[in-house]
Amino acid sequence: MEVLMAERANLVFHNKAIDGTAMKRLISRLIEHFGMAYTSHILDQVKTLGFQQATATSISLGIDDLLTIPSKGWLVQDAEQQSLILEKHHHYGNVHAVEKLRQSIEIWYATSEYLRQEMNPNFRMTDPFNPVHIMSFSGARGNASQVHQLVGMRGLMSDPQGQMIDLPIQSNLREGLSLTEYIISCYGARKGVVDTAVRTSDAGYLTRRLVEVVQHIVVRRTDCGTARGISVSPRNGIMPERIFSQTLIGRVLADDIYMGSRCIATRNQAIGIGLVNRFITFRAQPISIRTPFTCRSTSWICRLCYGRSPTHGDLVELGEAVGIIAGQSIGEPGTQLTLRTFHTGGVFTGGTAEHVRAPSNGKIKFNEDLVHPTRTRHGHPAFLCSIDLYVTIESEDILHNVNIPPKSLLLVQNDQYVESEQVIAEIRAGISTLNFKEKVRKHIYSDSDGEMHWSTDVYHAPEFTYGNVHLLPKTSHLWILLGGPCRSSLVYLSIHKDQDQMNAHSLSGKRRYTSNLSVTNDQARQKLFSSDFYGQKEDRIPDYSDLNRIICTGQYNLVYSPILHGNSDLLSKRRRNKFIIPLHSIQELENELMPCSGISIEIPVNGIFRRNSILAYFDDPRYRRKSSGIIKYGTIETHSVIKKEDLIEYRGVKEFRPKYQMKVDRFFFIPEEVHILPGSSSIMVRNNSIVGVDTQITLNLRSRVGGLVRVERKKKRIELKIFSGDIHFPGETDKISRHTGVLIPPGTGKRNSKEYKKVKNWIYVQRITPSKKRFFVLVRPVVTYEITDGINLGTLFPPDPLQERDNVQLRIVNYILYGNGKPIRGISDTSIQLVRTCLVLNWNQDKKSSSCEEARASFVEIRTNGLIRHFLRINLVKSPISYIGKRNDPSGSGLLSDNGSDCTNINPFSAIYSYPKAKIQQSLNQPQGTIHTLLNRNKECQSLIILSAANCSRMEPFKDVKYHSVIKESIKKDPLIPIRNSLGPLGTCLPIENFYSSYHLITHNQILVTKYLQLDNLKQTFQVIKLKYYLMDENGKIFNPDPCRNIILNPVNLNWSFLHHNYCAETSKIISLGQFICENVCIAENGPPLKSGQFILVQVDSIVIRSAKPYLATPGATVHGHYGETLNQGNTLVTFIYEKSISDDITQGLPKVEQVLEVRSIDSISMNLEKRVESWNKCIPRILGIPWGFLIGAELTIAQSRISLVNKIQQVYRSQGVQIHNRHIEIIVRQITSKVLISEDGMSNVFSPGELIGLLRAERMGRALEEAICYRVVLLGITRASLNTQSFISEASFQETARVLAKAALRGRIDWLKGLKENVVLGGVIPVGTGFKGLVHPSKQHNNIPLETKKTNLFEGEMRDILFHHRKLFDSCLSKKFHDIPEQSFIGFNDS
């Protein structure tokens, strides 16, 4: 029997390895030839054979079988190299964070993929019978990517949100993962424990909703008689053959198919494999097939529109519940997919672009007007072409033309030489397709503390007009200038020009105090707590006990941001030869006027500081008393520091005050009330009497405290003191009473015959003898002050990167202003400062040359885009400089302009020095502490940054500077005046030797230059003096000419330019103060690469740069924070918004299917669809007029959206290798899209506006009533669709039972019990299955009606088909229509 059958089918002898696909083909052919039963019998034998063979070969898998790929090492190394270069570019500010992320992901993805491709050949060559190899390529469950993870590299993973982690897992599972890699792979999709559980339930719920939508769809008829179909065409090559054949097999043709005049397939014929192959070979015209979309029935489906049953390969039987099958076949892979095999990390499967490569070597030419420059996704420069671009490549003997489609990126420049197969252009992937894209925000955080600048204008974001969020209009850099904030009210310096008078309008606000800083040796974390300075009594004194820790080491620098209250006038007093710029301010709190602390900067008139001079001082409000009293030191060693200039004026009373430098931490103040009265005044109290508070003492004085009165009469005045305190009459046993003027620490017993007390605070005991026999002891309260020792700020400056030996240091020193036991007298209610905190300037002494005796201070202004920064520079000056010439400028101000500009004139400019070259090198010292104030835009809150050497880097670009020895003869009397007069107030010339110790910016006002220089005059002057001059203009540009170059003043742009006699092209680079420069930019021809930063100091042979970190930002990014604002580490700088294609991994896939099916508008995905539907809805009725418009508009909209929905869902499943037949998805999509929303335009009598009804029902009602019903198509999600069925019982059993039932009762709805669920709920017979035919009673009427409808509908369907398929015809119809229809008919339609 078997032999006969085999002969009859003449089976082909196969001698090939059979994998999964071959097996599928074999089975389908067996079924075709022999039917189901016989096939299953054959397959059993195949199974047994397989098991026998497997047992015989006994394949086992051991860890030794996992062979790693030899090329892995250098591949990974190569990728690491690439990402290192990328990191560098990011550091230099060439690439921003998003581009860096994208590029690093692509680098690693490519590496991982390449390794995966290497794997198979490697196995095949080394060990073809390796069990791993056999298993992975057997076509059974499991694929290459799993093996790839075992022997290749694990690759990139995605985090729980589906974002890529840009740190790849470089090891494979054979080598074992490191701890970090292990943790990362715990995240990965579906491998995590969390993931599996959650996703399964999601898939289950999806199935439930799907079934709910389509449960009533059953095959009820053989043919619905539709003439429509959907055309599928193999010709245009869009659809791969595999998908094409999958789409066709099992369908039914809707039209005859002709090859020329010969009909090769007829209407209603089922398509099998043979027919499909014939179509593919003949490349016939588009094939029209019937789908569930075209079926004419509302609540069921016919056999021909559904096609073959997937189970047994024949047309589907009547009574088959195809709806439920469809719902389950879509939902079920969801449950599998969650638990499916690993994936490569959900990498952008849609993101890679196609490349255009050069056909041969040669030079490339294209029209540059058609392209404009842009950046690629990875931050590389490229050209974007907006229209088709023809690129010619000229090789030696031949011209190649390459056509580049629009919207592509050209990666080469014009006239560039390209090699064969080099990538010259990148075609953007799938702009037209509806790609799954989502908008992602990425925040960039600051890496270090500093001050923010940016290099272009920014817009305010419209929603935050007054906020600190700005939009960038073009690509630019953001700069963070280093210098960390350490806010404290300890010291704060205001820096202004000398002898200026100005108002400081200052911001009021809470002060912040620094408390208990925990300092680790290298880094300090500050805990700042904000306390109200004048709050309750306990908080009145902020805690400075840890002062010595405020100055942190390492990368932290001091910033003082004081807060001044109200207006304070700044008046600098001149004291001997120093200028003091005091800052006092009045604070109004609870209507009390309390003087607030001020900081004054002291700068000598000539700007020269000696060693240990005081740069600034700060009067701490805690050491300020209003009452008089006596200061007592405990066990304090002090050094009297007396300087002549410390003569302090208090409202006309002069007082000479020495200073005592403190070594120990506490002193005591004993308060007393003192009145100094003229000798003639009458006193109303007696000596040694005891008075209460507010007792009248003289005619116009009352006592402020109660206590003992002492009256002393001096020559011309009377001193009246009131001591507060307890009076104690001692017994004879009391030892304390022997002493007078003793301080008693707390805790000592005070013994008395009657009482025994502990003393809580320090007290001061004073013995008073009013008469010879009696005496008593006055116990007076004492105010204790704790002082921390002065700290050395040397730790602020780490080992010096600028290779300078002399470091300027700032120390904080506390001085007590009064000696031990000195009485302190307050003069007419002024407050008395007991301790002054000073910043003392010092510098290291070199053992070899302790020559550096003085430092010069100068002010520098640096402008950055209109924001002015003042720097106080302190430079060391070597002393053995012999001053020869005197000032030979009669005006006494060197080369300064005559108009009294506000430059700080610190040193005699035209002094001529003479010393050998080596000394010059030494004397060009860097400022080690450059102090820098911050001013807001509105010049309000001032604060101070000290830039240490760690924040600056030094570069010496001017290597070729020649030093000229000064010729002492031939100095004319006033050689420089002609230059100054001819320059006008524009610039100054500085002699080069002196340039390091002072330079500054000239006035910022606009000046018209009228006089031109007489070149010969100038030349002569230069040659006579033989000095090298620098010229600066108002922009702060600095030029460095050769001594014998000519100077030409260009009055147009007010810049100096220097030219050789022979106008040689060699000009020195121009560096302006305040300019930003990126790392890796060379300034000098052979100069070393710089660190990124801002120039704050330009010298003869070197530049000092304040380090800064550039961040690149692209247009559309939002910048947080204000220009010039001080930021802390970790603050948000920029937010990028970029589009990324969602990784096509099934963990994201399921939600994606769900989003499409639910038509959610949260996401940009379905937004596209919704928008499309809207636009189709609007434009078609506008073109066609009302009744036709709605009919055709709805039809077209529905057809379009249906097709795109199906394609989308299939895309997700196919990307996971899941095969689902289109018709299942079609059945569900048909249910989602078959409803229309009645609109209010034409009020119909049948439906109320806003009602959801089926499209076919609306059309039928319109035909029956012969009036236009206005409606528009809506996309319902599956949940809404299942709540909008015809059966309320089915709805109620799904969700919201009470609401649905109540509504149905109120409306009086009728349930016709057509679906399965209603019948199941009520326990009836369900209308499906093979016995279904018996339920439908054939009747005469029933037979007649379909024929008539069939005819009319055929015509109508054809009409629709014409309109639907032939767009050209359609357009011409429209235009004709427009001409034909008169306006009245339009109005008529509107009325109806």
UniProtKB/Swiss-Prot annotation:
DNA-dependent RNA polymerase catalyzes the transcription of DNA into RNA using the four ribonucleoside triphosphates as substrates. Its EC number is 2.7.7.6. Its main location: plastid. This is DNA-directed RNA polymerase subunit beta''. The lineage of its organism: Eukaryota, Viridiplantae, Streptophyta, Embryophyta, Tracheophyta. It is found in: Plastid, Chloroplast. It catalyses: RNA(n) + a ribonucleoside 5'-triphosphate = RNA(n+1) + diphosphate. In plastids the minimal PEP RNA polymerase catalytic core is composed of four subunits: alpha, beta, beta', and beta''. When a (nuclear-encoded) sigma factor is associated with the core the holoenzyme is formed, which can initiate transcription. One of its GO terms (biological process) is DNA-templated transcription. The gene is rpoC2. Zn(2+) binds at C224, C295, C302, C305. One of its GO terms (cellular component) is mitochondrion.
